[in-house]
């Protein structure tokens, strides 16, 4: 499997800050933040599957524009995989005809551009030899993470999450774990806000990584554009030997 980072920032501002989206091989998106807009029409047309972690706008906004751009160019609908609460939020708050058209009935209900597939924690979706497993996350709205397993190695993406014991009990059983992408949305000066928002800050990240019992290359995502240097400095000063690195746009993982 090949994962290319299209966006990994907590927000926008500057040429390199795109919100969360990862392109897996040519046909899968993990979340659909603003980074999707950097793909060409030809690349967009190849995407058949979108796996959504949760309903917050920085993770779903480009689904709307993506469908508008390429829906008519594709022979079949795009499948959005999400939990029941997330699908409900997308239907109520985005594809509701007030904010954006409902592409599950466009151009016709029989041949739409969009279809939903409901998933839950523990679901395993097999796509041409690739396995995507839904992982638990703890956030202010119902949320999940994902394990991507090529058969040779696995990459875990936590999605947006606060402290999450349930995640580590699953991750520590992944024998072929190679990469871990984990969020750290706040610096330690905003620890109380991180706790309230169910995100992580560096000191909380350290507590979470202490629960990891398997070796993995660790990358930090969802950094706020105004606090990248401060937050990474705090992470670099954490005790231990894990040495997480900041995720970057266009970073490619092969596994």
Predicted segment positions?
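Active-site neighborhood of phospho(di)ester-bond hydrolases with catalytic His/Asp-centered motifs
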Residues: 30-33, 48-58, 81-83, 156-161, ...
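Short amphipathic alpha-helix with an adjacent loop that forms part of the alpha/beta core around
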Residues: 39-44, 125-128, 168-173, 255
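Active-site metal-binding motif and surrounding structural segment of the metallo-beta-lactamase
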Residues: 36-82, 177-178
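Divalent metal-coordination and catalytic microenvironments
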Residues: 3, 22, 30-31, 54, ...
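Active-site catalytic pocket residues across diverse enzymes, especially alpha/beta-hydrolases
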Residues: 67-70, 94, 171-174
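Metallo-beta-lactamase
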Residues: 85-143, 240-254
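Cap/insert and terminal regions of metallo-dependent hydrolase folds
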Residues: 164-254
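Conserved beta-strand hairpin/beta-sheet module of binuclear metal-dependent hydrolase folds
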Residues: 1-43, 144-159
